[in-house]
Amino acid sequence: MYEGKKTKNMFLTRALEKILADKEVKKAHHSQLRKACEVALEEIKVETEKQSPPHGEAKAGSGTLPPVKSKTNFIEADKYFLPFELACQSKCPRIVSTSLDCLQKLIAYGHLTGRAPDSTTPGKKLIDRIIETICGCFQGPQTDEGVQLQIIKALLTAVTSQHIEIHEGTVLQAVRTCYNIYLASKNLINQTTAKATLTQMLNVIFARMENQALQEAKQMERERHRQQQHLLQSPVSHHEPESPHLRYLPPQTVDHINQEHEGDLEPQTHDVDKSLQDDTEPENGSDISSAENEQTEADQATAAETLSKNDILYDGDYEEKPLDIVQSIVEEMVNIIVGDMGEGMAISASTEGNTGTVEDGSDSENIQANGIPGTPISVAYTPSLPDDRLSVSSNDTQESGNSSGPSPGAKFSHILQKDAFLVFRSLCKLSMKPLSDGPPDPKSHELRSKILSLQLLLSILQNAGPVFRTNEMFINAIKQYLCVALSKNGVSSVPEVFELSLSIFLTLLSNFKTHLKMQIEVFFKEIFLYILETSTSSFDHKWMVIQTLTRICADAQSVVDIYVNYDCDLNAANIFERLVNDLSKIAQGRGSQELGMSNVQELSLRKKGLECLVSILKCMVEWSKDQYVNPNSQTTLGQEKPSEQEISEVKHPETINRYGSLNSLESTSSSGIGSYSTQMSGTDNPEQFEVLKQQKEIIEQGIDLFNKKPKRGIQYLQEQGMLGTTPEDIAQFLHQEERLDSTQVGEFLGDNDKFNKEVMYAYVDQHDFSGKDFVSALRLFLEGFRLPGEAQKIDRLMEKFAARYLECNQGQTLFASADTAYVLAYSIIMLTTDLHSPQVKNKMTKEQYIKMNRGINDSKDLPEEYLSAIYNEIAGKKISMKETKELTIPTKSTKQNVASEKQRRLLYNLEMEQMAKTAKALMEAVSHVQAPFTSATHLEHVRPMFKLAWTPFLAAFSVGLQDCDDTEVASLCLEGIRCAIRIACIFSIQLERDAYVQALARFTLLTVSSGITEMKQKNIDTIKTLITVAHTDGNYLGNSWHEILKCISQLELAQLIGTGVKPRYISGTVRGREGSLTGTKDQAPDEFVGLGLVGGNVDWKQIASIQESIGETSSQSVVVAVDRIFTGSTRLDGNAIVDFVRWLCAVSMDELLSTTHPRMFSLQKIVEISYYNMGRIRLQWSRIWEVIGDHFNKVGCNPNEDVAIFAVDSLRQLSMKFLEKGELANFRFQKDFLRPFEHIMKRNRSPTIRDMVVRCIAQMVNSQAANIRSGWKNIFSVFHLAASDQDESIVELAFQTTGHIVTLVFEKHFPATIDSFQDAVKCLSEFACNAAFPDTSMEAIRLIRHCAKYVSDRPQAFKEYTSDDMSVAPEDRVWVRGWFPILFELSCIINRCKLDVRTRGLTVMFEIMKTYGHTYEKHWWQDLFRIVFRIFDNMKLPEQQTEKAEWMTTTCNHALYAICDVFTQYLEVLSDVLLDDIFAQLYWCVQQDNEQLARSGTNCLENVVILNGEKFTLEIWDKTCNCTLDIFKTTIPHALLTWRPTSGEAEPPSPSAVSEKPLDAISQKSVDIHDSIQPRSSDNRQQAPLVSVSTVSEEVSKVKSTAKFPEQKLFAALLIKCVVQLELIQTIDNIVFFPATSKKEDAENLAAAQRDAVDFDVRVDTQDQGMYRFLTSQQLFKLLDCLLESHRFAKAFNSNNEQRTALWKAGFKGKSKPNLLKQETSSLACGLRILFRMYMDESRVSAWEEVQQRLLNVCREALSYFLTLTSESHREAWTNLLLLFLTKVLKISDSRFKAHASFYYPLLCEIMQFDLIPELRAVLRRFFLRIGIVFQISQPPEQELGINRQ
């Protein structure tokens, strides 16, 4: 401490001595100075001698301890300062230098703090006087250079020292002095030093402000923490903790400050050195006590240390040092902030102690953004959010609601903020000072001052901390001062100024855009875009603008924000859209000719334009990168391209200027917004913006329409709901919308239409003219539109105007009525036209004008001076519309070509001036407007952005690639296209994506129809880009894969040409037909034809050069990259791979269909990718295979065998690999996979291919049987197709394999094959049906029989098998999947095959039923017989008569018997299931025109009943009888009686052929229709002859010769009916009496009669045989009725001689007349037997009466009929009948006999006259004897007649 004092004293002593020693001091005018020095030295000496004890040392102002407040201290300080003050005021440079040097050291070491009040000026502190003194040393340009340096040094020390504090005016003064030294000093070193010092001062001023806020925040945090602890410890009573001594200003409003410092820019003198003059009141802020100062010293030390230690003036490198220091300060700050963050400390958001925690790792700006904790926040700034954190976005919204400028409550929370504000504002004002007229002089003070102020502003902005960025005071300062300054400088013709303005704008855009929405719009619209769009603007300006844009476009946040905030804002310009369009034009090189640029300039500008476009796209990619899924981790295309990461990195454009690069733009968090964008995301709703954008587009479209046709525009806007329908709505629209064409508005308002008039009235009524003089009112009225040309229209408008003017100004006395105003208005219009129109040569004078208006005021005149004033005003300024922006932009059409560069510059400068005015006016207009700015956060915005701008992008890139060979341009275009494709892909915007990919494909030159010409590097690069796109964006390419794969296909061809290798075309192509293409010398090699390269003759040189240029395409990198697309296909997602495969197949198809040279490149690739992708999940794989399989289907059927062979072989290999993977139960992937084999087999007729398919499948079965599951279906399907082939080897191999499967594979892997069991059986059945190979057929049936054994052995396997068809109950599965297919296929074989195979099939089918039927369920049998009965299905039978007949005779016959056998075997199950069907079937059989079948039918009926009758129920018997009845009725041949010959009847046979017998007799020669029918043997029933050729058919063939065809058919049918009738009679007989047959009985009767024996009465018929006992009497009566009906029909026919003759003549049945004798007799015989049996049956007593009645009637009728017979042979036929009848009657009891005998007696007597045979006579004799006895006519000789008489 003592040491410190010593050094101080040493400094002082040396300095004072040095001053005293100066010779100048000796002079008289310095006496005061001399005296002061001496006093001070004396003082020091005394002090040094005192050697005070240590505790008293504090009194000395030591640098290490803050001095104690005590009077002595002040005196001492004063005492020390006075000599120096006087020294500084001396005019001697040496003395001044010495003094300054000492002061600087004293301040630097903290010996001079100047905290004492200034004794000379109340309210100020000593330090203020010290600084003033130092500043005062600068006397303008003539000041000594050494002194200048010392001043700079001292001021820097003062500003940066941590020991002293200066504020407000004093700070300004220090800054101003350095500023002035920079401007005034002629010494370069001093200038540089001054500039560096300024930079450093500003850094410190702003850094302190930021630091203070940070410290305060920490303090608050500690405080809050302590409070919390306190609360935790003593929850009951808590004391308010002492608040820390924080320094606050008295609540001082912004306005106050503005007034105080209003003068800070106004120079009071014209001297340069006053250019920063400031008249700060000294009392401001002086009440800050030093105690508080002391408190913060320690806090500030951290930041200031770095400065105080560097005595920069002694460091030679003036430029560098300040930058280092700045950097170190900034770094230190960041470290402090980030360090705190790292500790995860919670920072309080408000003094109440609400806790708002900041998460770890959050950005430093986050805290600051939350309104610096602890700072007094004004009311307007306290949002009521539920969140405890105050977010900036909410402040913004608050702000936006408050458009009246800065909120009155806002104030500086700390004096340091005020300092910073004042400095900032001063610099802004300095930068706005205008330059002198004429060309700018780089040395002039004005220009240097402007540049310096801009440089310093840029430096402040670039280093701006959180407080600066968020405090409302600073934001308002930026809006009100900086932006206005920029609008002035932004169009400066001085490149450096312009460049600086741009840099500042960039910084603002980067860090402050949320607050500067309107300002940014003005800057873009009025400066950037204007310069780009104006054809006259200079290259330099364009270049700088585009440089700046390069930077803006490289920042994703900015790009998206521009779109969201301007293009989607109804009231803002479409900046993004215009920007892209302008850049696109520049990139295309449009408009550069007018500028007279050099080619080099044009190219560099184009490149920059492209670079911007590419940057924008990159930003969009970057912005939406989260939505992109990169399929590859590694994506380099050879070494030529950087990896995929390049898309997300932005290329660093070279920095715009030397003022420090804006790294923030390139960093990922991009602009300052990035940090708290998350908090703003609430306001960023993409859908909402999209709606806004649509509305905006509608409005713009409406305005465009309006400007062409007003009504159409209005109608459109109304239809779209954007405009109301009332006149008022429309009028308001016309008022407010500035973009409307003023002429059209005028036309619309002037129109005579009723509605238009209403709008016009509303329009005028919306004006308020009150208090305005007439001309002003008229000017206001005519500002908004251009008056229409027609007088009537003007008339209407003026009339309404006049009325409205008077309405608004009702107190006026000038105009008598509205008429006056109307006429005057009209005259003013005429006057303005007259005076200002160039067409009018003779202008109207004032007198003429006054004269013209005579008497218009109700016949009086208006005052002359009034009219005169009007004339003067109009002469001075014409009435015109207000200039809207649109009118000031010179459009191209109006521009005449500028003659010379000089003229152009002149024109441009004028335009720039105009532009600057507009910009400044607009800036000022918006400086108080608060517009809410949305910070975009959603990646969704990119979609509408891209949709909006994709066309100009595409145009720029296409033109670039098309007409420019510069590699850089090409690579930019390609990069742009890549990004565009990426965006279109990510958002699946298909049209746009396809457009870009097509463009890319087009520039590869691979797909052009004209063929490949010479390739340039850009085309090769395009190919590489296309491949890269395929590689990186494959997931999104969809249909665009088509273009890409087409190119790759062509590329392969190109590579072949390039390398000179002959392409591997497929052999056997079309070449053969046209003769060899390589035959003649003039012809090109084939491959060139393939690429469409050559026409007729060939230029070999050209080909060589093409080969060379294409050679590049074969570079290793390209080949590898192409390959990687295919190998990388495994990384595509499930949908993408399907698209990829689909288009690969399409391209392959095109290759193969090439007429000249089919190629298999893509087909090979398909095989490859199939291998690669086989490992995918099955779901994806099956979708892929659906496409590939379909392709193989087509390719496998290609007429070119080589192609098909390749396809089948590839399929085989793939299948083998696929099958190796196996398959789980219930999956169907194998089935889908193997389907192409089926398709090829089905469609390809080539034996080679079919054979190959079968071989492939056979190979699969042999090697992979264990892995096959659902694939069996396809295998059997292929063999099924092979089975019907005519090629022996194919059938043989297929059958061999099928046999192998059925015998061996089924044995081992039965459960795996169940699913295709049906297919196997079906396949076998197909082999069986191939008539060409009978042995195979028989073997196939044997295998089917074998299959049945599997089903029988393994029913469980079927039960457990689950399949798609889950509706089948488990117990039925064995039927549905096992038995049914077998039996069904056998039935198919029966229905389709030749006789021997058919028969074998039938046998096997019934064998299976008989063998396994015991396991069948009832409902299975129903299904089964539905199949079996198909055998009889008439519709399915062959058409040809002979085949049909054969079929019926053989198969149907066989089946019938077999069915009956099965029925009998399984009667219990089948009786109720099957019986009805069997009867129906039998009924069907007898109806067929086939005798054999008909007979079999009746036979079977008989068999079924006889074998099973005992088990029949009553109901079944009813059915049986009904069936018999039906058959009977149907088969009565009624047509025999009704048939009549047609008119054209053939001649009857010649008389010689006709029998000589009388026609009415049934002679021996007459033919019994049944004669030729073989009688059936008694065992016939057991075994029907399988093949017995119908005898009827022979008869029919006999008939054929004589009868015509229609008759033939009829006669044949009639014959069969007759047969059936007879068969039926026999059947009934058999059913009732079997095994007793009628024949046997007849024979017995005859024998007995012959013997006339006594044992005649042996009762044969009492045996219990036949079914008689099971039939009820009613049923028997039914049968009887049938028999008797049949008998009567035969009788009728036999009696109808005429009809029989006619039939005979027509050729029916042989050489003589037909008869029905057998039917007549046998039906009656059977009937009689039944009746007599019932008559004798004790159990049927109830029916006896009826039986007797029937007997009597039948017998009498029969006898009567017998008596009418004339023919001997006919009577002979009745012999047995009579015997039967008489024998039976003889056997009945006497009582009954009586009744009978008396009934027949007369008839029997009549019979005696016939010549009867002996046997009959014997029986008759007995009959009559019996009559005698019974009627007691005679006595019976007992011994003779053993007849019972009961």
Curated annotation (Swiss-Prot):
Molecular-function annotations in GO? guanyl-nucleotide exchange factor activity; myosin binding; protein kinase A regulatory subunit binding
What name goes with this protein?
Brefeldin A-inhibited guanine nucleotide-exchange protein 1
| Gene name of this polypeptide | Arfgef1
**Residue spans with biased composition (Low complexity)?**
661-681
User: What Gene3D superfamilies does this protein's entry cite?
Assistant: 1.10.220.20, Arf Nucleotide-binding Site Opener,domain 2 (1.10.1000.11), Leucine-rich Repeat Variant (1.25.10.10)
InterPro entries listed in its UniProt record: ARM-like, ARM-type_fold, DCB_dom, Mon2/Sec7/BIG1-like_HDS, Mon2/Sec7/BIG1-like_HUS, Sec7/BIG1-like_C, Sec7_C_sf, Sec7_dom
Q: Which UniProt keywords apply?
A: Cytoplasm, Golgi apparatus, Guanine-nucleotide releasing factor, Membrane, Nucleus, Phosphoprotein, Protein transport, Transport
Q: What is its main location?
A: cytoplasm
For the modification Phosphoserine, the affected residues are 52, 286, 289-290, 394, 407, 1076, 1563, 1566
Protein location: Cytoplasm; Cytoplasm, Perinuclear region; Golgi apparatus; Golgi apparatus, trans-Golgi network
Where, by residue number, does the polypeptide cross the bilayer?
none
Which stretches of sequence are listed as region DCB? 2-224
For region HUS, the annotated ranges are 554-574
The residues covered by the SEC7 domain are 688-877
What PANTHER family has UniProt attached to this entry? Answer: BREFELDIN A-INHIBITED GUANINE NUCLEOTIDE-EXCHANGE PROTEIN 1 (PTHR10663:SF137), GUANYL-NUCLEOTIDE EXCHANGE FACTOR (PTHR10663)
